[in-house]
Every structure is written in C-alpha cells, then in structure tokens.
Amino acid sequence: MSESRSRPTYTGDIASRGIDRAQEYSVETQEIAFTDDQHAIWEDLFAGVHRPLLLEHVCRSFLDGLARLELDPTRIPTVAYLNERIQRRTGWRIERTAVRYTQADDWYRKFAQRIFLITDYLRTRGQMEFTPEPDMFHDIFGHLPYLTQDFYARIEDRFAPAYLNATPEEKEVIKRLAWYSTEFGVVVEDGRFKVFGAGTISGRAELANTIMEFYRLSRDKVIDYHGAVYEQLQGHFLARQADIRRIIAGVDALHRQGQMSSQADGWNVVQVLYRDLGIARDGLLGGGVILAPFDVEVIAKLPKTVYAFNPMFFVCESFEQMENLLDSYLKPIARRGA
C-alpha cells in the first residue's frame, strides 16, 4: 500500500511490532492509494460473497444496509465515502488503524466515542476463503452495512459503557458476547435461520459451511422449517445439554492448550471432540458446527476462536431478543458505581 509522502505509511503490521502510537489511528482525510492488485482482490472478495445463493441466507438488515452503503464492487472505498453514508444516519464515524488486531481496551475506548475502526490490512490471494485476522474487507463489507441502521448502532452502543466499567473477568465475557453476536450471530427471520454476524458474512468459506448446516438440520429432520424453528432449537439444545457442556469444556481446554490456531483445527474441532468424548454424532450434534440458543451463561464459558472457524453459532429469535439478552448482562455493569 502506498500514499503520498505527506501522509503516514500504513503498513498493516501488528501494533507490537513498534508502530508509532501517534500514527496508530488516522483521521478521515488520511486516505490510502490502493494498487490495482489490491482493488482486484477486493473485487474478487465482493463477487465471491455477493451471490444470490449465499445472500438469501443472510438477514434482511444486512442487505438493506448494503443497499444504503452503495459499495463499489470493484474499488475499495475511501474513509470519506464511508463516513458520508454512515455518520449522517447513525452518528457513528469511521477511522482507519494501522493495527491488524486492535486490543480490546483501545477498541472500546473508540466505541465510547462512536468510532468504528477499520484496518489498513487487506488479505492476500491465499486467504480469499478465510483470513484469521480481520481485514478491511471484513470491516467494511461485514460490519459497515449495519452501521447505517439505528438498531445496530444501539447494539454497538451497549458494549463500551459496560466494558470500560468491567472487571477483567467481566471484560472477557463481554468480548465473547460481542464475538458470538455481532461477529458470528444467527437470527431467526421468516421462519428460517439467517446469518447476522459480520465475521461469517465476510468469510466465504465459513458462510458457505454455516449455510450447509442450515440445510443439514432440515435434511436430517432435526428442524422442520414449517414450524417454530427457535422453539425446536431450544428443545434439541436442552435434550443434548449435558453433551454440549462437555463439548464446550473440550473447546476451552483445546483453546488453553493452543490447539485451535489453524483453519482446519477450528472447523474439525467439534468432530474431534465427539470422537474423543464418545458423543454420538446425530441430531443437533450431527454436523460440523453446533447451533444453540443465545445464552449469556453458555457464551461466557466458550472462548473466542480468533484464528479458527467457530465451532458454535448462537441464535436469537429476533433482534429485540438479542438486545434484551445483551442488556441483561451489560447494563448492570455499565451502571455500577453511577
């Protein structure tokens, strides 16, 4: 990536490699002059996800936001372009960061100012299906369509006041709640499971595999999409709760041992645990991932799988339910000491 000599050089390096803190974040006027090759990667990423057979399984709010954002499928947008379409609608604004994976404390301090950070890092040709670190395609295509809408701005507004007032243990839970909602959440819409999370939407391989699980649940007669799908999911989850607790404990143990650091390990970890724990692979637990009702206590026990595919996706019956469940944990922390 290159810029004029009067502007900082954004390298995409991780912060610990010595980035000058004064240049860690930019303002909207500091734009990057992307190469033709970088625009071509953006174009191919956009085309790879922007397909009717995939987008029909993505929630309406994302599609509405994508229409509002009016992204050019062939060119990486400028920060100024993004701010013009977002700030007037929800009050949030965009800043670019030279950090590939921003530390949570810095992230939520920016959130408190209603600033959403996008990295200057763009995945390579070898990472088109999956990138272990969030890149600018993930940040822009995955998240920013939602930030044109008040309901999503309200969801994001909940996190910073709680995080900045939380204990270290509570901070870890808050990070997991954000991960399994805005990054990898699923919502019920029109009697179907629909992808909501930006991490899933912006990763072609994970999006396709998640959609395949939606189909498997119907094929194996686990979920009848003519009935109340959320209630069915709750029933199956309760029936297999003991096994699911063992799987979550197993995922946590693998995470602590550093054994979830690759794409293959992340996707296959559930199947490995079924084998090692002697859990039958059938019904709700018959696929490569597990769908579960959104539950704060369950999510608190499941680590983020940053460098791997997610083993579990949590489902909300509606966005209103998601807001209420997040409030049940976040509001008391945010108000503490007030």
Set out the residue ranges of the language-model regions.
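The feature captures two recurrent sequence modes
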Residues: M1-L147, F151, D265-G286, L291-A338
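A contiguous, surface-oriented mixed alpha/beta subdomain in the mid-to-C-terminal portion of proteins
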Residues: G126-D327
